[in-house]
Amino acid sequence: MNGYGSPYLYMGGPVSQPPRAPLQRTPKCARCRNHGVLSWLKGHKRYCRFKDCTCEKCILIIERQRVMAAQVALRRQQANESLESLIPDSLRALPGPPPPGDAVAAPQPPPASQPSQPQPPRPAAELAAAAALRWTAEPQPGALQAQLAKPDLTEERLGDGKSADNTEVFSDKDTDQRSSPDVAKSKGCFTPESPEIVSVEEGGYAVQKNGGNPESRPDSPKCHAEQNHLLIEGPSGTVSLPFSLKANRPPLEVLKKIFPNQKPTVLELILKGCGGDLVSAVEVLLSSRSSVTGAERTSAEPESLALPSNGHIFEHTLSSYPISSSKWSVGSAFRVPDTLRFSADSSNVVPSPLAGPLQPPFPQPPRYPLMLRNTLARSQSSPFLPNDVTLWNTMTLQQQYQLRSQYVSPFPSNSTSVFRSSPVLPARATEDPRISIPDDGCPFVSKQSIYTEDDYDERSDSSDSRTLNTSS
């Protein structure tokens, strides 16, 4: 047993021993080696007998350790700056741990009266936690990371910046030993992508669910009422698309999910009319919804017959009449709006027929669709304006339009005098309004013909020859 204790060995001269295989080198204390003593570094720094030595060799070791600590701090700062340069400006505003530059300046310097004593080495678990916090605070380039702002880990990170300048390491190999478990464990401590943030791509839309984004909280003004729906904004309306829709579903099923209020047969006809294109079918349905919405706004007014600027009662488009979606829709094609039903009794002449609603004295069952057109203003090839009937190319409305010649006029011979005698309407030549609503109280009358029987016998069935004979 020597004078320095059992762990210490003197470096003697070469001993004649057989050569051994080179073993893995274990770190030794540099101060003890300067004084001719070998001591293992593990658990030795606090109890080293030469820790306060001020000889030339020990001072050289102290200076070398300070240079290495400054290099480590500089490398950390450069690494953080390079990572911050990759982060876009929109993500820098998010709350997160303070940068390492502020962390070093935050702790108070120790008072000068107390001698600077070396701090004990930090456990590897704390180093790994601090490294994991640093990697979590910097978002990865491929995905967004959830921000962790735990106070205990932040304090450990603050202490890490402080120990980089104040802790004295007693060997050049000691720094490698301390940094090696930090790097080895930080590689295994990468925080995986937070399960709260999910990137859902449905039809080319990237959507972020709740959590991780402060704008998606319920108290945010931008938060929608339906968090699990995707809002598709089109030129004529907005529709909410559920996240549960998959790309491999048939287009008809997708339309049923988006428009649950429409009948499946109507959706199928619209889809066939669009050639199976789902986007075009959605646009058609959205445009029809916008026209119905405009009609619902008008239905809030008193249900009376409004006149256009030119004073003609039958020159309206469909949206100018006070009708609601329940009175005029694809599902109710055989229903007549209540505001356009006239009484069969022509003796009840209101003094101002345009001021009050034109309602019959008793309810009448609906029979035929209303044909809103002016026979003199529109040709036979285009009897409707483009926005009169949105879903005109469906087979149901086409068949009803082919049956328009079977309708009869609901007006008796003297009922049009109510409108012609009104001072609001200008005097016009008598024309066939082509509104056919048969009543229970009046008998069926034959269709009023424009030509007499003698003229009709002389003319052919061709519409071209009729036009020529009329012009002559």
Curated annotation (Swiss-Prot):
Residue span of region Disordered: 89-128, 155-191, 430-472
Entry keyword set: Developmental protein, Differentiation, DNA-binding, Metal-binding, Nucleus, Sexual differentiation, Transcription, Transcription regulation, Zinc
Compositionally biased tracts (Pro residues): 95-123
GO terms (BP aspect): adult walking behavior; male sex differentiation; regulation of odontogenesis of dentin-containing tooth; regulation of transcription by RNA polymerase II; sex differentiation; transmission of nerve impulse; ventral spinal cord interneuron specification
InterPro entries: DM_DNA-bd, DM_DNA-bd_sf, DMA, DMRT, UBA-like_sf
Region forming the signal peptide: none
Compositional bias per record (Basic and acidic residues), positions renumbered to this chain: 155-179
Keyword Zinc: yes
Localisation per UniProt entry: Nucleus
UniProt keyword Nucleus present: yes
One of the Pfam families matching this protein, by short name: DM
Gene Ontology terms, MF aspect: DNA-binding transcription factor activity, RNA polymerase II-specific; metal ion binding; RNA polymerase II cis-regulatory region sequence-specific DNA binding; sequence-specific double-stranded DNA binding
CDD domains (alphabetical): CUE_DMA_DMRTA3 (cd14419)
GO cellular component terms listed in the entry, alphabetical order: chromatin; nucleus
Tissue expression: Expressed in testis.
Ranges annotated as DNA-binding: 29-76
Primary location group: nucleus
Domain DMA: 249-284
Family membership: Belongs to the DMRT family.
Record function comment: Probable transcription factor that plays a role in configuring the spinal circuits controlling stride in vertebrates. Involved in neuronal specification within specific subdivision of spinal cord neurons and in the development of a coordinated locomotor network controlling limb movements. May regulate transcription during sexual development.
Other comments on record: DMRT3 is a marker for a subset of spinal cord neurons (dI6).
Domain text: DMA domain interacts with ubiquitin.
Subunit comment: May homodimerize.
PANTHER family, A to Z: DOUBLESEX AND MAB-3 RELATED TRANSCRIPTION FACTOR DMRT, DOUBLESEX- AND MAB-3-RELATED TRANSCRIPTION FACTOR 3
Protein name: Doublesex- and mab-3-related transcription factor 3
